[in-house]
């Protein structure tokens, strides 16, 4: 049962071959058995999930089902969930019970999905390996000695291990796509503003975007149908009609123009991944796509610009955690200054503190022009590169990561090496574009991911191409050998 996709489970529920309670209990039992090995969940909401599942069965019996009625999903622990702990992977919020639901949570509730638990993540979404969590590292289900990627590593590992059929993630510099690639699942980062950020704990507000993580493009489309849309509570949410993302999944790829940027195939790319992308190219060509070599000349500046801009926004956003209003508070502070210093020193992990320090530095009066302003100019040039490319191509094909999943603790002491694991995903966030990562092969029993980048609000096209590709391949059907 756990090998089935959301689309298949949805049909089973409609056909009454299984109830939502049975389905939810099956996944809860699987989580209890396997999660202690993977550490992909921070909270498991068993009682709440079974209550929701009973209500879903009642709606199904009355013929009142909505798009995801009865389907268990997991929420990344960055989304506020009313009366359920929302930790953001941090000691700072270990005791935080949100008084309201994030819009992402609200939308999936409206669609009828069952919240089965909150997934582990890098603290405040800062990381590429899920080793920065206060609740311990998540392990990659394909190799328990390797990372699942980050920051949405818990969601990626849970979907890959079939502990849940779908989950939410957030993507600030690749945090949906990189773990999706390393765990062999499908992950979509929508256009900036397509999905509401209300109730999503902020890391870098001009870069953060929520999106779906699932086995297939079809499942990602079903989840995005529920997630996407304008929200007046989020000032960055864009008021644009939401199409039915499942309606165009089977559209022909005849005449599709795909760009191959030479900057993404240079030094640092594992040769097996390069070969897998070439195989994706040949598969799409057989379906009618044509390929054009393009240039994205400012690609090499994306990572340096990102690691100025994201920490700058992080230092501002995380200033609110001071031990006064909510979150961790140190014991017996001698005065207000001591309260601030010790609460933040004890409450934040080392990577978060590193980024706050970098951000404070680049925003300081003497360095603002030299770093922050220059990075913003580079950001515009990167966006312009993409806009020029989209004058001649419909989408862009690249690797999702330079290597397969690396060993736990391999890069934790070398921040630059860790940061470069997102080298193929960062530019997309700087430009605010949509992109999807999907399974494209294996190397030494480890998944390889490809990435498609689209123009603004062209999520439907990305899902269509990925779905058609998945009809011709079975990489997405592979699952790790767990109990």
Swiss-Prot record:
Keywords: ATP-binding, Ligase, Nucleotide-binding, Protein biosynthesis. It holds the Pfam family Amidase. It comes from the Bacteria. One of its GO terms (cellular component) is glutamyl-tRNA(Gln) amidotransferase complex. GO terms for biological process: translation. It is an enzyme of class 6 (ligase). Its EC number is 6.3.5.7. PROSITE patterns: AMIDASES (PS00571). It catalyses: L-glutamyl-tRNA(Gln) + L-glutamine + ATP + H2O = L-glutaminyl-tRNA(Gln) + L-glutamate + ADP + phosphate + H(+). GO terms for molecular function: ATP binding; glutaminyl-tRNA synthase (glutamine-hydrolyzing) activity. The active site is at residues 76, 151, 175. InterPro entries: Amidase, Amidase_CS, Amidase_dom, AS_sf, GatA. Belongs to the amidase family. GatA subfamily. Allows the formation of correctly charged Gln-tRNA(Gln) through the transamidation of misacylated Glu-tRNA(Gln) in organisms which lack glutaminyl-tRNA synthetase. The reaction takes place in the presence of glutamine and ATP through an activated gamma-phospho-Glu-tRNA(Gln). This is Glutamyl-tRNA(Gln) amidotransferase subunit A. It comes from Coxiella burnetii (strain RSA 493 / Nine Mile phase I). The gene is gatA.
């Amino acid at each position: 049962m756990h090998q089935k996709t959301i689309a298949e489970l949805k049909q089973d529920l409609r056909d009454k071959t299984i109830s939502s309670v049975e389905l939810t209990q099956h996944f809860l039992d699987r989580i209890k058995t396997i999660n202690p090995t993977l550490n992909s969940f921070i909270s498991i909401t068993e009682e709440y999930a079974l209550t929701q599942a009973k209500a879903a069965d009642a709606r199904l019996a009355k013929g009142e089902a909505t798009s995801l009625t009865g389907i268990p999903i997991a929420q990344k622990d960055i989304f506020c969930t009313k009366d359920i702990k929302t930790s953001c992977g941090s000691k700072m919020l270990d005791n935080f019970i949100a008084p309201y639901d994030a819009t992402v949570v609200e939308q999936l509730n409206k669609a009828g999905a069952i919240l089965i638990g909150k997934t582990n993540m890098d603290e405040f979404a800062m990381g590429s390996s899920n080793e920065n969590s206060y609740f311990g590292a998540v392990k990659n289900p394909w190799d328990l000695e390797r990372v699942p990627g980050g920051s949405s590593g818990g969601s990626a590992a849970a979907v890959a291990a079939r502990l849940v059929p779908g989950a939410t993630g957030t993507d600030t510099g690749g945090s949906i796509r990189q773990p999706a690639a390393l765990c062999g699942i499908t992950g979509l980062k929508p256009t900036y503003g397509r999905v509401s950020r209300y109730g999503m704990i902020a890391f870098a507000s001009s870069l953060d975007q929520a999106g779906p993580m699932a086995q297939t493009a079809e499942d990602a489309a079903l989840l995005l149908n529920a997630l996407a849309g304008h929200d007046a509570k989020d000032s960055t949410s864009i008021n644009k009609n939401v199409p039915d993302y499942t309606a165009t999944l089977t559209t022909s790829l005849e005449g599709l123009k795909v760009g191959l940027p030479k900057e993404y195939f240079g030094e640092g790319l594992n040769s097996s991944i390069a070969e897998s992308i070439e195989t994706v190219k040949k598969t799409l060509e057989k379906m009618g796509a044509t390929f054009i070599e393009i240039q994205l000349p400012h690609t090499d500046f994306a990572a340096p610009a990102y690691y100025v801009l994201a920490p700058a926004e992080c230092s501002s956003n995380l200033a609110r955690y001071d031990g006064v209003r909510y979150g961790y508070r140190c014991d017996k502070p001698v005065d207000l200054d001591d309260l601030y210093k010790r609460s933040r020193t004890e409450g934040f992990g080392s990577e978060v503190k590193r980024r706050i320090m970098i951000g404070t530095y680049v925003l300081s009066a003497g360095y603002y022009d030299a770093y922050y302003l220059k990075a913003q100019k580079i950001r515009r040039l990167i966006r312009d590169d993409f806009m020029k490319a989209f004058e001649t191509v419909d989408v862009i094909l690249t690797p999702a990561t330079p290597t397969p999943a690396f060993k736990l603790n391999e890069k934790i002491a070398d921040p630059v090496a860790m940061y470069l694991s997102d080298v193929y995903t960062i530019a997309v966030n700087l430009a605010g574009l949509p992109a999807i990562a999907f399974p494209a092969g294996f190397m030494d029993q480890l998944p390889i991911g490809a990435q498609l980048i689209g123009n603004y609000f062209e999520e439907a096209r990305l899902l269509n191409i990925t779905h058609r590709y998945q009809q011709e391949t079975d990489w997405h059907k592979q699952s790790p050998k767990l109990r």
